[in-house]
Amino acid sequence: MNQKDAAGRFPEPVKAAAGLKRKTTRLLLPALLLSVLSGCQKEAVPKSSAAVPTTPASSQAVVSKSDALLALSSYDNKYYNQYGTYGPSYKANYWFDIAKTKRMDFWTQAEAIETVIDAYNVNPTVDLKNKVQYLYHGMRDAYGLTWSNNEFNDDVIWGSIMCLRAYEIWNDGGMLTMARQNFDLVWARGWDTTLGGGLWWKTDKLSKNTCVNAPAVICAMKLYKATGDVSYRNKAKMIMDWMVPRFYVASTGEVKGAMNTSGQIYEGALLYTQGTFIGAANELRPYYTTPDYRAMGLKAMDYARNSLSKTPGGILQDEDGTLDTQGGKSIFARWACMFVKDTGTAANYGPWLDANATQAWSIRNSNGIMWNLWSIRTSDTENLNSWRTNGGVSMMLNLYRFR
């Protein structure tokens, strides 16, 4: 997940940055984030203006499932676009911004579709099921069946995960085939023994990043469960075995972001990479007793709570410096909440995640839209992009995996 330019491409990795995409313009973030952003990032964005302090989350009522569904409905009112037929069905996409200047970028589009899948998972309705299909059709319509022309291996993996999660709802063989073919594409061009293994972030083979390797573990495990082909589980284990000693800091739970061709780490933890590592550990956990993936996931969760929040145990950091990181909370919420549900750790992490959802909802604007700056009220006048405003929706919905 890295930030791209207007043409949808991402910059070369730069020193002190790595797992994101778009143009890697230097981030105008607090010192906390300056040390961690870059490898997969693509373009920097200007600072937001108008900001109105909000009531602390601790004094707010807990968000309800109906609130979470309303948040998605408000989001869809601004960004969802059903634009035509697709065979006997329909196709749709999410707009990039409120002004509808273009469709959402490839990988963020896939992530926004995953948020609709999250909604279906916690509230299965015909309407949400159909939206998942229409949006999937929109991806096929815009990008075709295989994505070899996309140089970003992580983009291809994000899209494949979306297809697999849609397949879990629809049991549509085309969704599974699309995921399988594109994962196989990334494996063929991205995996080698340079630096001991791992997937390259891009086809230029200048860095190996968590933003592709952790999601690839998730993708491979989902392919294994969908097909029964044990080679995918083996690939997931190979990736994780390579990633853990290089990116996971066992003493703290931090997950580093990227490594250059000299084997030097040049990016620290970000919410989306921390979250997908937690998701990867959770996918492997039921199948392997050693290493202890549950313990790794717990440690990574603790690091996010203590060090990727504005205060220990508080509200998640903004990560507002690039387009890619603006929606990082969306990805973190998904995989963190799945982990909490699957490991039965709601008593430990639930209050913290709930406080974040409550705080996000408390800063919504008059249209029910929440940006990623969860300490100030969302602007009513800014042309907000759809990735920046996805995190609160995801956090609210994914709580209901374990609540």
Q: Language-model features: where?
A:
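Oxyanion-binding "anion nests"
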Residues: 273-288, 293-309
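CBM-like carbohydrate-recognition segments
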Residues: 59-115, 119-154, 166, 208, ...
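Extended ligand-binding groove/face enriched in aromatic
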Residues: 129-226, 230-237
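Active-site cradle of extracellular carbohydrate-active enzymes
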Residues: 213-216, 220-224, 232-281
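Bacterial Sec-dependent N-terminal signal peptides
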Residues: 28-66, 70
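N-terminal secretory signal peptides that target proteins for export/translocation
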Residues: 1-22
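Structural signature of alpha-solenoid helical repeat junctions
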Residues: 108-111, 124, 155-158, 175, ...
